[in-house]
Amino acid sequence: MIKLLIDAHVFDGKYQGTRTYIQGIYSAMITHKDIEFYFAAQNVSRLKSIFGIAENIHYIRLDATNSIWRLAWEYPRIIKKYKIDYAHFQYICPLIKCCKEIVTIHDLLFLDFPKYFPLSYRIKNRTLFMYSAKRADLLLTVSEYSRKEIKRHFKITEDRIYVTSNCVSMVNDKIGLTDVKAKYGLDKYILTVSRIEPRKNHQMLLKAFLELQLYKLGYKLVIVGAMDLKNKTFSTLYKSMTDEEKESVLIFQASYLDLSLIHI
């Protein structure tokens, strides 16, 4: 039986696409009884609530909170202890190779659009992502665009890069949806869902909302997503708003699969 380790530390942090990707793939794969799945994260209870309990599913509690310590020491130790055959990592693999590795690189936007990312971020991740991509036994990405960009930036032939496309999450159509107006005070609204960072251009959306004075027409701007990279333009604009304007702009966090978001 194949032993497959999944680096699931992303489930310990804020909601993001990488988390949804892992959840989607392995919610489908865990039905394969000829594979033993080892999910590793600090919040094991959260993983259990998502992937459930089965004979072929195991959970490993991570001790390291520091990514360097986790990749340099903890994962090599786990791989040896549990005699793992394959390990699946997002973007960056451990310093030492102890088994066959699956690496998913979702995108290289910091290389495609460098002006939106700090120099230190670009230098560090270019080095680590390239090292991981070239060393991977199985290299995955999520779109043909990313596949071509990985080839271009890292000089890796396309036949080594496999696309595992992002998909729409299936939602139980029997869920009783709450009245959005009653629950959130929303009637007419504009919705955007993503982390708040410069390249997502929330600042332009907010500026347009204010310049058109849509709040005076009864509209609200609903932003679902955590503040990620510093967005000074957005923060400055938001702080300059009047109380009336701020009452029409709602910012809150929710899982991409959370009922709160589904309701909205």
Model-derived segments and spans:
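Carbohydrate transferase catalytic cores enriched for Leloir-type hexosyltransferases
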Residues: 1-262
